[in-house]
Amino acid sequence: MTPGEYVLADTPVVCNAGREAITLEVLNRGDRPVQVGSHFHFAEANRALDFDRERATGHRLDIPAGTAVRLEPGDSTTVRLIPLGGDRVVHGFRDLVDGPLDPAAGVTSDEDAASAVVPRGAETSEREARA
């Protein structure tokens, strides 16, 4: 091996292999472009984005880490989402979930977690109201 040499695998690297993906149609109803990062809890994305937030609860974009999807005003696009990994605890973002998504923590399904997102998703969160 030479210093700095790359030793690559014979097979391609597949990101998020084995993660069950869903697809959603997203429309940007706003007057400005919206970017959503790779690990953002998609259900809490910008209010100008029109999509099924209940289905998106507990999911993030199926894109490489550190990248983003840009949604132009008036444009509709299809996105692939995969479940959030790790402990599946969501804090921050738009403050619509602010806690665990899984049964061990008292939430029995993504639909239950969505009950926190969907009613408040169209309104201003407590954190946004304080700002």
Curated annotation (Swiss-Prot):
GO BP annotations, alphabetical order: urea catabolic process
Residue span of region Disordered: 100-131
Alphabetized UniProt keyword annotations: Cytoplasm, Hydrolase
Main location class: cytoplasm
Top-rank taxon, per record: Bacteria
NCBIfam families linked: PRK13203.1 (NF009682), urease_beta (TIGR00192)
Protein name, as recorded: Urease subunit beta
Source organism phylogeny: Bacteria, Bacillati, Actinomycetota, Actinomycetes, Micrococcales
Gene name for this UniProt entry: ureB
